[in-house]
């Protein structure tokens, strides 16, 4: 409630300030026009006295300066007025161009069996733990999202941008959700050499693609890996032909691990490792047919987590690594095939291994492999369609009884644009989760949504 009041108050103040800025610029423009007209009249009177005959009007430094200021003010007012639409909110802070963006999303979800965790599907609970007839209904607006894109003026060929983005999946009650941090980074780009440095929190380089699902988790825990974390990233691009590009990215990222075995209340095993995780990706983009481009990439990471085993200084390091391939392949004008395959170990913080990292009973990393494939159709008129499948398959030899041994899902959805800004959609999916030495769990999931983009 406090945040809602603050947000409304901020919006009110922002809009008032925005209007005041336009009004102030208009007044300045009016004053400058009057000054120019007065100077022109005085100059004309003096000229008529000295030279009665007609002659071309001379240019003066003062007049040129005032005309230039007047032109710049007119251009600035025109730019502000064009950007003042409620659904394209831009404003200037000094010389920074700041754009507000996001969407409001309302979801209604029915599950035929207990899904973890209802609002967003990860996996299905085992029939031995939960009655298989225990269906669920969820209503939520937590995926509502907003952010700010920030752009500074180009300076000596260097482009500086930033992003801040949040949603409401930060915990709290179902009707009192908390804000959650998604992105916050600065990016400096040398345009001539196509080299950039990024510092802050954003997506992993590992397996960078996502399928288009109405379910918030985009097949994470059932075939799609990769998340967000703090990082320092270096990127370089090369033009290798007409509409073709090679790109290389490398990043030092924070190692986000499980809570420590000995001190779970305050010590993170990734933090305790004492050094960052290394991520990298190489990608190529090539034109195919119908002026559409295909992209291919290979990516991966390596890091370590340190678990304290006792209070005498005994500890054990656990590796975390991955290797992934990604592809985007246009098939026709509005049809594309996208997907990823991967293999790795200790992938819980990357939403792999069905969110299992280390077998703490056997003190062993959990290996896993998986991937996903999606067919995307549209937009065709006001419609868009998606079909896809994903699977995450941990190594049974690394598991203890009761741990998740496989998780897969298949889905189909459609979106329809009611207006330029408002979209409705529906999705049906089937989920099946296997367990080591326990019964499986499966569920049919029906998901409807309404979205207002801004």
Show which residues each predicted segment covers.
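Detector for outer-membrane/organellar transmembrane beta-barrel domains
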Residues: 275, 280-404
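Sequence/structural signature of outer-membrane beta-barrel proteins
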Residues: 111, 153, 168-173, 202-208, ...
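N-terminal periplasmic/intermembrane-space "pro-region" immediately following the signal or transit peptide
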Residues: 18-117
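Outer-membrane beta-barrel "beta-signal"
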Residues: 416, 441-454
């Amino acid at each position: 409630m406090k945040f809602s009041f603050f947000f409304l108050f901020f919006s009110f103040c922002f809009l008032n300030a925005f209007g005041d800025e336009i009004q102030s610029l208009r007044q300045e423009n009016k004053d400058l026009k009057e000054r120019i007209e007065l100077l022109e009249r005085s100059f004309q009177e003096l000229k008529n006295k000295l030279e009665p005959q007609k002659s071309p009007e001379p240019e003066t430094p003062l007049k040129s300066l005032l005309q230039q200021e007047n032109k710049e003010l007119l251009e600035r007012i025109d730019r502000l007025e064009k950007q003042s639409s409620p659904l394209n909110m831009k404003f200037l802070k000094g010389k920074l161009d700041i754009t507000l963006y996001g969407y409001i999303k309302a979801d209604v979800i029915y599950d035929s069996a207990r899904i973890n965790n209802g609002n967003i599907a990860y996996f299905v609970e085992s029939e031995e733990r939960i009655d298989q007839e225990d269906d669920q209904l969820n209503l939520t607006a937590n995926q509502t999202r907003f952010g700010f894109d920030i752009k500074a003026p180009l300076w000596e060929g260097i482009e500086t941008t930033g992003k801040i983005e949040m949603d409401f999946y930060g915990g709290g009650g179902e009707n009192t959700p908390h804000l959650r941090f998604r992105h916050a980074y600065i990016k400096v780009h040398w345009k001539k050499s196509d080299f950039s440095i990024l510092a802050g929190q954003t997506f992993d380089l590992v397996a960078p693609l996502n399928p288009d699902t109405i379910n918030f988790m985009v097949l994470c825990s059932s075939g799609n890996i990769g998340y967000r974390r703090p990082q320092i990233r270096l990127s370089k691009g090369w033009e290798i032909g007409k509409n073709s590009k090679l790109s290389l990215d490398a990043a030092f990222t924070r190692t986000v691990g499980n809570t420590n075995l000995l001190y779970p209340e305050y010590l993170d095993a990734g933090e305790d490792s004492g050094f960052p995780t290394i991520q990298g990706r190489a990608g190529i983009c090539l034109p195919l047919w119908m002026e559409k481009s295909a992209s291919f990439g290979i990516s991966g990471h390596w890091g370590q987590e340190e678990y304290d085993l006792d209070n005498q200084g005994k500890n054990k390091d656990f590796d975390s690594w991955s290797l992934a391939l990604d592809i985007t392949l246009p098939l026709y004008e509005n049809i594309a095939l996208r997907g990823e395959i991967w293999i790795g170990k200790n992938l819980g913080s990357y939403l792999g291994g069905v969110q299992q990292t280390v077998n703490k009973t056997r003190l062993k990393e959990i290996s896993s492999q998986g991937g996903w494939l999606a067919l995307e159709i549209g937009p065709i008129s006001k419609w868009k369609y998606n079909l896809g499948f994903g699977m995450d398959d941990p190594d049974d030899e690394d598991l203890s009884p009761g741990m998740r041994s496989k998780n897969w899902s298949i889905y189909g959805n459609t979106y329809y644009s009611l207006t330029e800004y408002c979209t409705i959609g529906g999705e049906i999916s089937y989920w099946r989760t296997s367990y080591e030495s326990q019964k499986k769990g499966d569920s049919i999931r029906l998901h409807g949504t309404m979205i207002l983009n801004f």
